Each structure stands twice: as structure tokens, then as C-alpha cells.
Amino acid sequence: MENLSQNATGAEGKDAARKESVLTLDGINEKQPFFLSDGIHMAYLSNETGEFQVFIKNLKTNEKRQITTLRHGVLRYQLSDDETKLVFEATLWPEEIQENTAFEEMTPEKKAQWEEDLDWRPYEITNLTYKLDEWHGMRKGEFSHIGTAELSSKKQKLFTSDCMEKMEAIYPSWSHDGKKIAFYGYPYEGAKGFDVELFVCDENGKNLKQISNDNGIYGDHAPAFTADDTGIVAMVFGDFEDGSCVQLPMLFDLMNNTHRYLIDEWDESICHGVHPLRAGSLEYGDHSNYFKLTKDGKYLYFQTGRHGRYSLCRVRIDVAKSETAEVSSVTDSVIKPSLVEMVLEGQTDIQEFAMNENDQIVTIQADWLHPAELWMNGEKLTDSNPWLSEYALADVEEHWVKSKDGKADLQYFLVKPVCFEKNKQYPAVLDIKGGPTTMYGLTFWHEFQALASLGMAVIFGNPRGSTGFGRAYCAGGVCWENEAVDDLVQFVEAAVSKGFIDEKRVGVTGGSYGGYMTNKLIGRTNVFAAAVTQRCLANTATSYGTGDMGFVSSRPIPKHFHMLDYLEDRARGNIISYVDHFKVPLLILHAYQDYRCGFEQAEQVFIPMKERNPEIPCRMVMFPNENHGMTRNGKLYHQVRHLQEMTNWFVKYLMEESDWKTKADEKSEKDTDFMKTQEVKG
């Protein structure tokens, strides 16, 4: 959701404004729509010619013009304020720049030949950033580049001067006067290869200047110029000594070469920074920026999260500018804490928002019982899933409990089974989020509803290490320590105390970090009766050299450490060392092309389970041609099969065969008696 047309709430009336209509049906996919100021034309990306290109369409006449012809399409774009030109990001190979073929679209035949040639090409690797799970594998020599295109003449230009041919550039953004472009670049090699910096160049790509310097830029959304073009707002992860994880808006002053926070990282009464990462909610499509500046330059609007709610806040930039001390270090910012205002909040999950020139706001938001819909002024504009009204859905209860060490208040949620009956006990599943620096929120969870519909309760919560609860809550790598384990067990004990959960029939599951904690819990506690570990991390020592971020650690290698000492440090306390204590039925779900937690991590759990614990039911399901994000964006068949595997496992070992161990012991005794008989006969 890129922007809101001024005409969307014009004189045509409420009913006309709410009328849904299909704007494009030209390609297989269309995305990133942007309404021009006349309310008649719309820019968007369409792959009707094979790759995603920018089109401009007249919504009254349906006439359209293709603006770009990038060889491999456009990843994202932004129109200038005067709507005469656009800046784009595109993926290209070095030889395509050298041979001037960047703007030559390939025919299907040429593309097939090109892909075949690429498949045979050996990978040349010189940098640590050679693979990423989001790329679905290793890079094959491509880079992200930026350039411009004029809407009238369709003239396209690629920025290749001032080292920009060799430096990857992403998320370009126009200044309001159309003379400058801000973007994120990757200037480093080695272990810092994933670190981005903020850059500015002229509209023609000349006069490149680096603006940030190790400020912790989080380059997943475009930077934004202030109204007077004298500053740029970008998001940073502060380099705090306590190791806490909080994303904050930082204003870079282009006139004075200074920078400062725009909100106070110590004031957590309203929000915990900007956009605490949500734990894999039900979302689709490309995301727009989660922060936006008003046209008058007074306010910065941003999405935020606190205590399981995702809300919308704003901060006065001009007040912050006059009342904030200018600093040159990311850790020295001083700001008055009364600047942040809550704009929209409630028992909801605001996933996207857009504003028009009058600062009217449309949101995409969900809640526990409803997937995301469009909302405006407190009214729901769409109803995309009316079929849900035909099903009984389980509601959610929010609870708080004190941590075992008494140092924290813990938030957890409890989902009762559908058709819940009092005075009856039910099995339950503890679901652990990934991250770990994410937050479970009140959004629609199909997985939880599926478990509840089968007669199981669901327990989920935010143990220490989660975002949304302040810096102290997620400081010091606590998510990997005993505190997080204790917190998760505390969730279960608190839920069991409600009286309707059978403590002998509690299962546990989770993905990524949640899979790591699933393994850890069944190895170090006797609380659970069955487990499903998903896309798990098992051995942090081997993940150092196999995962796409294995070398990125919260505990960097001390200079005085030898490599062997470092690997031993990572291996110390590894969860596979507890495999002898894995005494519950275990299902392992893993994608074969997972580049974050490699498939070998699943094998390191499966193999010792079969060797050391042959009497324990253990099964591994591998999903081919899928990556770490399979349950969110994988093939639909695989997503359904993944859910079925998990639910079937818990139905079997928490409901149908909860006495499997007794039967196994009886069978073992019979086998032993038979062997003794054979020995006597022999």
C-alpha cells in the first residue's frame, strides 16, 4: 500500500469510496500501486511482458504506457514529487552493464537460454555475503543497482559513476525538489558485508556522498527526506552497551553533518521503538514504508509495537529539532520524552498505513479473529474473507505472570479449544515464536485456529528477549540463556493452573529460534509429552560456517581467542548434547534449501535420535525446493502439508496415543521375554 489517492475520499460519497473494483488484469502479477496527484493515473509494477516493469495507467480510459525495460525487471521504484520521473532499483550482472544490455528486455527464448547458461556458470565468491535465505540460495554474480527514468520520454539511466557500478545500492528515495537521491549502499567486505550505510547522490548519479558511519542503519525500507530537504530520516538499531534490540528513527542533518534520535529510546510508556519485528504473521505482498513524514514536515508517523499490540504513533520533528541536543555519536542522544503521541491503538495489529495530503490515514490491520482488512477512520472498508463467518473460531485470552526469578512481568496468551466445555481437561501446545527479537501479537493465526479446532488449547507468549517490552527485557542476549527457558515453562505452568489443561498432555513446537528452544526444552525439562521442531537451529558451532548469518553473532570472536576456542565456546551447551534426554515423540520439519538454519541442522537432530533413542518415535519430513520462509511464502501444497504434519503429530501423541510410552514399555518387556525364551531354548 504505497499511497492514498486524494479522490478516494472526495465528493463521490462514502458508498462510492467503498466500491471495490479491479484496476489491472494485464499481467500475472501487479504490485506497488501509486496514485498520481490527478487521481486518474496510477503507476504500478506489472510482469505482463515477462519481468516486472513500471507502467502508468489511465484508470478512466484503461490506456497504459510501459516506462521501464530493465533486463531483469524492477524491484521497487519511487516517483518524484513533480511526477515527471522515477528512481528504480534493479538486479543486474556486471557484463550487462559493460555490454549496455541493462535496458534490453529478453524474449522468452532468450531468457530460457540465459537461464540455462547461468545454471552452468561456476559461482565466483570473494565476499561473505554470497548467500541469503531470502535470495533462495547463493548469488550468481548479480548486484542491485539504481537508476532513473523519465515518464514522458521514457529515457532510462543507470548510475555507474563514483564506484556505484561495484557497490550494491538499494531502496532509492527522491528529495522533494527532485535534485537528490538517497539510498542505502553496501560499502564493506568481510564480516561487515551485511552492514549498510546511507548515501546521497545527485539526480544523475554524480557526487556520491556517504552520510552515515557505523550508525546501525537498518536498510529494509527507503529513507525519507525532510520537507525542506535539509535532512534525511532513516531507521537504526542503536549500538547499546546492554546489547538490547530497539529500532529508532534517526535524523541526519545534511547541513551540519550531525545526527540524532527523534524519539527517546528510554521512554517506553507508549512504544518500544519503531516497528518491533512481528513474529511471522499472516501478511502478503510487498510492504510499504512503516514510517512516513507529513508533507508539512512537522510529524513523523511510524508503526510501533508494545505488549502484543501493533499501533501507529507520531512524533513532532520540528519540536524535536529545537529541543534536542545535536550529537555526533549514536549513543549520546538527548531528547525530552513527551514528544511521541499515540495515533491509532487497540486490540489490533496495524500492518500497513498510507496517508494523503490531508493526512487522512488508511490502514491494513488484523486482529485475532480477522485477517487483515482495509480500515479508515475506525471503519472497516473491506471484507475479504466472509467465509470465516461459517466457522467456529477460538478466542484468545491475555494473561500476565511473574517470572520465576521475580525480575520480569511476562505476557502470554491462551487459546481455548473450539467448543470448550467447563470441567473438562484438554491437551495443549506451547508455540514458540522465531526471532528471537520479535513479538507475538494479537493477529490472526491460522495455525493456532487449526490446533484449537482439533480440541487442543494453544499457549503462546513473549519470553525475555522479545521486543515490545522495553530495552531491559531484551538486553544481554537473555533470549539464549536460562531465563528464556524458565519463562516458557512459566507460561505452561500458569496456563495449567487455569484448570482445564491436562499437564501430562502438553506439546511444544516452534520454528527457527522457536525450533531451537523446542529442542532445548525437551532436552532440559520433563514438561512436554510431544514435540514438533520446525526449521530449527541445533548446533551453533556448525551453523557458524553453514547458515547465511552463522558468522553474525551477538558474541563476536574476541581477538585473544583462537578459532578452536571460539568454536568450543559456540558448542558449549549445544542442544544436541542433550539428545540422550529427548524422550518424547519428535517430529522434525525442515526445508531442504533452508539457508538460514541449514538442512544439516535437522539431520544433526534426526541422526542421533535414531541412534541414541531408537525406542522414541521420531520422524523427519523434508520439503524440497523451499527455504527458511516456507510456511510464509512457500508453495501452497507445502504450506498445507506442513500444517497437516504438525497437527497430525499432536493429535496422535497428545490425544489418540497419549499412552504410547506405556505400550512401548509393554512391547519392550514382551520382546525381552521372547529373547530370554530363545536363549533358554538355545
At which residue positions do the language-model features occur?
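Predominantly five- to eight-bladed beta-propeller fold
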Residues: 1, 7-9, 91-147, 196, ...
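Non-catalytic accessory segments flanking enzyme active sites
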Residues: 1, 87, 119-127, 132-145, ...
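Short loop/turn segments that connect beta-strands within beta-propeller blades
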Residues: 4, 58-62, 150-154, 202-206, ...
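Beta-propeller fold detector
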Residues: 19-24, 65-68, 157-161, 209-213, ...
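Active-site-proximal cap/loop segments of hydrolase catalytic domains
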Residues: 25, 461-682
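Conserved beta-propeller blade repeats
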Residues: 27-43, 71-95, 120-122, 132-137, ...
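Structural motif
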Residues: 51-55, 96-101, 143-145, 191-199, ...
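Cap/lid segment of the alpha/beta-hydrolase catalytic domain
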Residues: 383-498, 502-504, 511
